[in-house]
From Swiss-Prot:
Belongs to the NAGSA dehydrogenase family. Type 1 subfamily. InterPro entries: AGPR_AS (IPR023013), AGPR_type-1 (IPR000706), NAD(P)-bd_dom_sf (IPR036291), NAGSA_dehydrogenase (IPR050085), Semialdehyde_DH_NAD-bd (IPR000534). GO terms for biological process: L-arginine biosynthetic process. GO terms for cellular component: cytoplasm. It is found in: Cytoplasm. SMART domains: Semialdhyde_dh. Keywords: Amino-acid biosynthesis, Arginine biosynthesis, Cytoplasm, NADP, Oxidoreductase. It is an enzyme of class 1 (oxidoreductase). Its main location: cytoplasm. This is N-acetyl-gamma-glutamyl-phosphate reductase. It comes from Prochlorococcus marinus (strain AS9601). Catalyzes the NADPH-dependent reduction of N-acetyl-5-glutamyl phosphate to yield N-acetyl-L-glutamate 5-semialdehyde. Pfam families: Semialdhyde_dh, Semialdhyde_dhC_1. The active site is at 154.
Length: 351
């Protein structure tokens, strides 16, 4: 299976190269990056050494499609949409890591990503409707049959996996859900950003994107589909001075206030017992980003506050792996007919 990595020099693309080079069932057929096109891969990334030391090539439909079966688009929001239809028309399957196809309505995307919509004049509502939301834990069968996969955002991944079992079975109320998340700086990408400078964000913690963060509507869209009811929730992200890692604390109201922490843990464990990358921790053991760093795992924990009938669900992921490229490889595996976790048995180098 030949895979083109488009946008290979960003954090998502770099992770993709590092993962795919170790999976013998795949061959990297193209490395695309306009800023570094014409230079050799090992010259730019000697720490992810490729034996054939390929050139990084200019991003174009012709270059991408000449030898590829699948295109992994690791591009900024909006840019993926300029390539997707042309690649599909040439018979390639597409896995998109941007937000371009996460919404079932192009109008919704334009509303949320208005800045990008002003630059990229899209008319591919049909592809928005066709795209499969690439969260394997809820869409495994659809992903395996799809030709266009929209990989979830990192925050939605860290929030939806803990929420899905309780929403799908009506354990928690649809109103009053609060998500409090923290992300490492790599979530902001590789482009220079003053807010991500060490002297700006080091030794500090700050919230951003209150009320109107783009991932709020993405979480709400999927949560509403899962629950069968319209859900509006409160999501607040924070930036923490670590390079990679994401932690979410989710609060909800139990429909049955008699449920205990053990009850809710058993439900969570049973729901995900067939997913080897999901670890449900014992009651009173709470996940740390240290435990999942450099892995595709998600650690979950749950606690019930019996005083007020609230449930607290916690999750920890590596935002560049389960929150981004590792999840994309899970989707690639499913589309290729392989085990979902092929090549993703990654070791955490604690501490």
């Amino acid at each position: 299976m030949n895979v083109a990595i488009v946008g290979a020099t960003g954090y998502g693309g770099i992770q993709a190269v590092n993962l795919l080079k170790k999976i013998k069932k795949y061959k990297i057929s193209f490395l695309g990056g306009n800023k570094t096109s014409g230079s050799k891969w090992n010259e730019n990334f000697p720490f992810i050494y490729l034996d054939n030391d390929p050139y990084i090539e200019e991003i174009s439909v012709d270059n991408i499609s000449k030898n590829a079966d699948v295109a992994l688009l690791c591009l900024p929001n909006g840019l993926s949409s300029t390539l997707t239809r042309k690649l599909l028309d040439r018979g390639l399957k597409v896995i998109d890591l941007s937000a371009d196809y996460r919404y079932k309505s192009l109008d919704e995307w334009k509303n949320v990503y208005s800045k990008e919509a002003a630059i990229y004049k899209r008319n591919d509502d049909d592809l928005c409707k066709e795209a499969v939301y690439g969260l394997p834990e809820i869409n495994k069968e659809a992903i395996s049959k799809g030709r266009l996969i929209a990989c979830p955002g990192c925050y939605p991944t860290s929030a939806l996996i803990p929420l899905v079992p309780y929403l799908s079975q009506g354990i928690i109320e649809n109103e009053g859900i609060v998500i409090d998340s923290k992300s490492g700086t790599s979530g902001g990408g590789r482009e220079p950003n003053q807010k991500l400078l060490l002297s700006e964000c080091g030794e500090g913690l700050s919230a951003y994107g209150l009320i109107n963060h783009r991932h709020t509507s993405e979480i709400e869209q999927v949560a509403s589909l899962i629950s069968g009811n319209k859900i509006e929730l409160l999501f607040t992200p924070h930036l923490v001075p670590i390079s990679r890692g994401m932690h979410s604390t989710i609060y909800g109201r139990l429909r049955d206030p008699g449920l205990t922490s053990d009850d809710c843990r058993i439900l969570l464990d049973n729901y995900y017992r067939n997913f080897k990358n999901i670890k449900v921790l014992p009651v009173d053991t709470f996940p740390s980003t240290k435990w999942v760093k450099n892995t595709n795992q998600i650690f979950l924990s749950v606690k019930v506050d019996i005083r007020n009938g609230r449930i607290i669900i916690l999750s920890a992921i590596d935002n560049l792996l389960k929150g981004q490229t590792g999840q994309a490889i899970q989707n690639l595996n499913l589309m290729s007919g392989f085990s979902m976790d092929e090549g993703l048995d990654l070791t955490n180098n604690f501490p």
